[in-house]
Amino acid sequence: MDCKFEVELMEKIDSGDNRVTLYFSVPEGFTWEPSAHISLALEGYDENGEFHKDCVRKFSINTLMEENKIGITTRTDSSDSEYKKRIAKMQPGEKCTIIESGCRLPIRRENRGIVFISMGVGMSTVRPLINAIIKDSEKITSVTNICVNKTENYLYKDELGAADHIMCNSRFCHHRTDLRETIDSLNEVDKKIFYVVGSREFVQNMVVLLKEHGVAKEDIMIDKKPGILDGLYEGMSYDEIKKIVKAQKK
């Protein structure tokens, strides 16, 4: 959904391992669902009446509406990204603009278990989903959160640890071998709903792995545009999928 909301940076937190979390004000009239994404435009994105896409990036909102702030977390070590350099230098009081928002990962309440699989800052997308389910677990039988991170510094590790005794079982993996073993250990894998968030390669590998475990395409949720999951489930590359989607639009 296209929109235009000016937001002000309220707080900036160093989340370690070259990650920064930014909290922005909530503009009047702006609402969102758990796991929603926004396109955040920095100053100058529409300079001289032209749209400068290098001033815009898409982020998942890691907060719920009731927290009264819009939170995002991103890595800052992309040396080739001028955008990342600029956003990492932002200070409280500075402003930017939300120019698009949407949500591709609605919570499915089907009297089944839900498994979240994320890599690195992908946990930023999962956090609000878990917190929303803890608040209202109607028609959700269980929640398993599997997070892959190279170090012990997982996002929201303390928060998720506290949630474990409520209804969310969190498991942390250092590499993909651990992840495969963790998925192998799940009960009734083919009866659960899986949400996968991470890099393109990570999502692609997870879709293939889940298919190998008998998970139906309809039970895999990814934060990608329509048509991407269909191709990944059939073993296609992103380039192959892109060509098909492009041809369908003609």
PLM ranges: what are they?
Residues 3, 73, 79-250:
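FNR/FR-type flavoprotein reductase catalytic core
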